[in-house]
Curated annotation (Swiss-Prot):
GO terms for molecular function: adenylosuccinate synthase activity; ATP binding; magnesium ion binding. One of its GO terms (biological process) is IMP metabolic process. Mg(2+) binds at residues 17, 45, 284. Pathway: Purine metabolism. The keyword Signal does not apply. L-aspartate binds at residues 284-285, 290. The active site is at 17 (proton acceptor). InterPro entries: Adenylosuccinate_synth_dom1, Adenylosuccinate_synthetase, P-loop_NTPase, Phage_PurZ. The lineage of its organism: Viruses, Duplodnaviria, Heunggongvirae, Uroviricota, Caudoviricetes. This is N6-succino-2-amino-2'-deoxyadenylate synthase. The gene is purZ. Belongs to the Caudovirales PurZ family.
Length: 367
């Protein structure tokens, strides 16, 4: 049994889309965890592009599967899982997962078609991705024995929709009891946990009701994957030089029918073309244009106050001039100093200048 401090948690300190998938892949290749953990929902995408240009776009499967020492993938009890999506992601990476084990916690929730249909109408008003995640979570919370949507209660469904096809591809996968799941956690040599979405979207720390259906803090991520807090020895928080929110929603006539929510008082919403001279980014899941904002001291301070990261990954540095990036770094350091965040400075240890692992630097570029 290995019970020493051994886990890294990757979280988002803004509104999402900060490059968690990119830094997760980078760290997995560098730190080589044998166990990777997630408890995602199907409403957020995570992208990693390796040094050879292979692209991984996952909503269910950890990007840490690229670890050279990987043995086990754990999907935690706090997940709201789209089984077909997980199946497809596993099959697309079957070459990397040969001889590996994938365990799905029996208490993870399944997103069924009825949950997607339940969110189809009213959730448009708050910019929801409408993937059924909240509805699946609510169904689990209701605890109706006649409507049990946990993985453990739907063995036939899991066998038909995911386990059978995945095993045929040579990847071992099954449902795990809590005891079986925790045995892997305790026996692991090194663990990497990947959070989803972002601090400012948290149901308690965000701009309610323009939020997601749970918190996105390291503590919540640990709870959702059943990771003992004592095992955590590093928290990496991801930020963008220019934070984003998901798109507003419009009908076929071009009329706005949904708003994804406000920003912090010291932020300004920017126009992709007029202010930045570039095409708008599209969201990974909905393929709609993201809203983009200036960097916020208030957002940074609020996030660091709760997250208390050991390191920061500052992404999209290529969107700004070097002096502007330096100003953002200064804002992060000022917030960290005011909050007495421990550890060596600067807090920003990794800098992203593009979409691939080759674009991550350990020093800020000056040209």
């Amino acid at each position: 049994m290995n019970s020493n401090k051994k886990a890294t948690i990757v979280v988002d300190a803004q509104f999402g889309s900060t490059g968690k998938g990119l830094i997760a892949g980078y760290l997995a290749e560098r730190d080589q965890p044998d166990v990777v953990m997630t408890a995602w929902s199907a409403n957020a995408g995570h992208t990693y592009i390796n040094a050879e240009g292979r692209k991984f776009v996952h909503c269910m499967l950890a990007n840490g599967i690229v670890s050279p020492k990987l043995t086990t993938v754990l999907i935690g009890p706090g997940s709201q899982m789209n089984a077909e999506l997980l199946r497809d992601e596993i099959l697309s990476c079957a070459d990397l997962l040969q001889g590996k084990t994938i365990l799905l916690h029996a208490s993870a929730a399944l997103i069924l078609q009825k949950h997607v249909e339940e969110e189809a109408g009213p959730m448009t008003k708050i910019g929801s991705t409408k993937k059924g995640c909240g509805a699946a979570m609510i169904a689990k919370i209701r605890r109706n024995p006649d409507d049990n949507n946990t993985v453990g209660a739907n063995g036939d469904y899991m066998e038909e929709h995911i386990y059978g096809p995945v095993r045929e591809a040579g990847v071992f996968i099954r449902t795990a009891t809590n005891a079986e799941y925790m045995a892997v956690v305790y026996d692991a040599e090194r663990i990497q946990v990947e959070g989803a979405q972002g601090f400012s979207l948290g149901i308690n720390n965000g701009f309610y009701p323009y939020v997601t259906s749970r918190e996105c803090t390291p503590a919540q991520v640990a709870v959702d994957v059943n990771l003992p807090l004592a095992f955590i020895d590093k928290v990496v928080a991801c930020m963008r030089t220019l934070p984003i929110r998901v798109a507003n929603r419009y009908n076929d006539k071009g009329e706005q029918i949904g708003w994804s929510g406000p920003c912090y008082p010291d932020q300004k919403e920017l126009d992709w073309e007029k202010d930045l001279g570039m095409e708008a980014e599209l969201t990974t899941v909905t393929k709609l244009p993201r809203r983009i904002f200036t960097f916020s001291y208030e957002q940074t301070k609020a996030a660091l106050e709760v997250i208390r990261p050991d390191e920061v990954f500052l992404n999209f540095c290529n969107y700004l001039e070097p002096d502007e990036v330096a100003a953002v770094i200064g804002t992060i350091e000022r917030a960290a100093h005011e909050l007495k965040v421990p550890g060596p400075m600067p807090l920003a240890r990794y800098y992203g200048y593009g979409p691939t692992v080759n674009d991550i630097d350990l020093d800020m570029r000056h040209q």
